[in-house]
């Protein structure tokens, strides 16, 4: 068989400008007249965006209270002392009182914050069974091996929901009360606990197993709750649309955080007389203290915050834009000085020639 340079092989591409990489190309020549305006314009744009983001973040109001219960920090220290690093006795309660001299504009969001809690630990992050959480009946009885040691109870019953993430579910609870005048009684502020989880989590990723004779409790028969839970998953809420694997608090907790200090949404305040925000007056947050954090050196906070078009309070993004914009301006001036200095030398060299 003779070989021909023009013969097309089985794997030879078409003889086109695209496949043979003969398309026309253009490469800009970055002269000083082009590069310097680009640096200055980019710097001004970044600084403008940074100022807008920073101003918007500073306009967000926040109230926070550390109720970890360190000695001498209020009545929550009594609950923390009773637990001695573990969960305190059931029903231990404390409170936080504060006064608002003016309207706290809404919409107002209630968060809890944990610190020194590494949900991003690999073994912790994979300790779950997504098939079980999606309501698959076979996974309910046979949890994934990743859930170990929270896969089966000591008597052999499968744990539902299994895994370390579910076992460490945050279980403090809060209620907010308002007193308009010193002589008035405290009135409970309605907390909207619905739609606090991501839409995709609540409607797609988390599903309850099929009901048995119309009962969710029968669907979970033959399973055990996680060791740290005081009640089974089907009793998380009396609302049938907010219990089991689709409980909003549970779904929010199961979306793990990337950093050791994180906030999770607990409720919105947007109903009745509080749709525009929190009116002035005295407020009291009643806290049911259940969750132990002192054993791992953590802290827990309750936070009231409103939001802006960019979300919650986060000055980092605005500061980052300001830093990048300032660096662009500084580098532009440095290159301008270098250009002016060495341009004169080039002109002198050309005159000598």
Swiss-Prot record:
One Gene Ontology term of the molecular function aspect: aminophospholipid flippase activity
Coiled-coil residue spans: none
Location within or outside the cell: Cell membrane
Cytoplasmic topological domain residue ranges: 1-33, 337-353
Exoplasmic loop-side positions: 55-315
Residue stretches spanning the membrane: 34-54, 316-336
Pfam families the record matches: CDC50
Function noted in UniProt: Accessory component of a P4-ATPase flippase complex which catalyzes the hydrolysis of ATP coupled to the transport of aminophospholipids from the outer to the inner leaflet of various membranes and ensures the maintenance of asymmetric distribution of phospholipids. Phospholipid translocation also seems to be implicated in vesicle formation and in uptake of lipid signaling molecules. The beta subunit may assist in binding of the phospholipid substrate. Can mediate the export of alpha subunits ATP8A1, ATP8B1, ATP8B2 and ATP8B4 from the ER to the plasma membrane.
Subunit note: Component of a P4-ATPase flippase complex which consists of a catalytic alpha subunit and an accessory beta subunit. Interacts with alpha subunits ATP8A1, ATP8B1, ATP8B2 and ATP8B4.
Protein name, UniProt field: Cell cycle control protein 50B
